[in-house]
Amino acid sequence: EISLGLVGSEMCIRDSYLPETSNAKFYFDNALKLLYILNTTTLNTLMLHASVVTQAGNGYAFLGKSGTGKSTHSQLWLRYLEGYELLNDDHPIIRLMDDEVIVYGSPWSGKTPCYKNKQACLKAVVRLEQASENKIIRLRGIQAYAAFSPSCSGMRWQREMADAIHQTIVAVTEHCRLLHLKCLPDEEAARLCCQTIHER
């Protein structure tokens, strides 16, 4: 059975209704994702297009356009930096809770089967860009907002949801470090990113 918790209700659906030989599971999965977004956006909650690693209860999200190397960068952290694990590799969930931004695993993790029912305090968000050398800068204000916003899912044409998305993004920019990393897919990029995130 597939159990789905929605705001104010619960749903239980038998997966035997979804034929393996059709596209039913693909469409059903996307419908659930849409329902989740519709039911949680106004609750200080956003679904991201990102890859997230965690260590000691803290989370670090890597954003970027499709093909930028989010999954690759996460794998570099797992390979070269001690104590990190993958939380989600495609669509993690974030929520503002008591002046902290919490990042959660989700049932949607793209090509990487990483479906963890875990959470962490989101400490930093890094927008990745492919480049010929490794360089990182801290983002603040409107630059931080502009870097984070494109990776947030939601129905922005609906006023109430657009306002909720805006408020949550502002909260993230106030509570988390946001950075822009131009990088190669190498160990140096992972170490530079990690070091900069943890600088005081």
Describe the function of each predicted region:
Residues 51, 55-65, 79-200:
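Glycine-rich, often acidic-flanked micro-motifs
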Residues 69:
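Conserved glycine(s) of the Walker
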Residues 5-6, 47, 119:
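Short aromatic/basic micro-patch
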Residues 73-74:
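Post-Walker A alpha-helix
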Residues 1, 43, 48-50, 57:
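Short coil/loop residues immediately preceding or within conserved phosphate-binding loops
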Residues 27-46:
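N-terminal pre-Walker A segment at the start of P-loop NTPase domains
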Residues 1-13:
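Short, small-residue-biased leader/transition segments that mark boundaries at the very start
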Residues 18-22:
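Phosphate-centric recognition/catalysis
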